[in-house]
């Protein structure tokens, strides 16, 4: 993972890295401690290269939900790493769970038949919400512009 992170990300010198991380650890039943160490090391390397970073937690999907204990551990460790390294975590799992549980959208409306990956609608909503959150944080930090506290409440697709 670290070799690929170096060549596919860090060597390209991006301004912002959006790192979807943790789903494979959940599905493969990897050790949470080792996963935390790898993520923390990856975040440190990205920051040392001068890039900003946003972590994205696992998706709410049937295959991830089958391993709910592991998913919960991964989301907690991502939160701890984010707090330690002072980076944001986009709560994709909670957003998607909200679509299904609170908004009563069937999982099949945003997840493809493999039970894991999002479809075009799911990715479009995810991209819109993530973009809104990035704009919100940039505005608050750099411009001092007031943005509603939860962009997800006014930007449904």
Language model segments and positions:
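Alpha-helical cap/lid subdomain in secreted, periplasmic
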Residues: 1-157
């Amino acid at each position: 993972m670290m070799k690929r992170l170096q060549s596919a990300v860090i060597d390209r010198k991006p301004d912002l890295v959006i790192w979807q991380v943790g789903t494979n650890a959940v599905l493969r039943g990897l050790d949470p401690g080792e996963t935390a160490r790898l993520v923390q090391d990856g975040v440190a390397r990205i920051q040392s290269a001068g890039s900003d970073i946003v972590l994205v937690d696992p998706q709410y999907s049937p295959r991830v939900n089958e391993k709910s204990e592991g998913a919960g551990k991964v989301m907690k460790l991502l939160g701890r790493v984010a707090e330690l390294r002072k980076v944001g975590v986009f709560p994709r799992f909670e957003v998607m769970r909200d679509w299904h549980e609170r908004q009563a959208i069937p999982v099949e409306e945003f997840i493809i038949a493999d039970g894991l990956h999002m479809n075009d609608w799911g990715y479009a909503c995810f991209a819109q919400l993530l973009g809104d959150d990035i704009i919100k944080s940039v505005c608050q930090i750099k411009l001092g512009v007031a943005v509603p506290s939860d962009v997800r409440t006014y930007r449904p697709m």
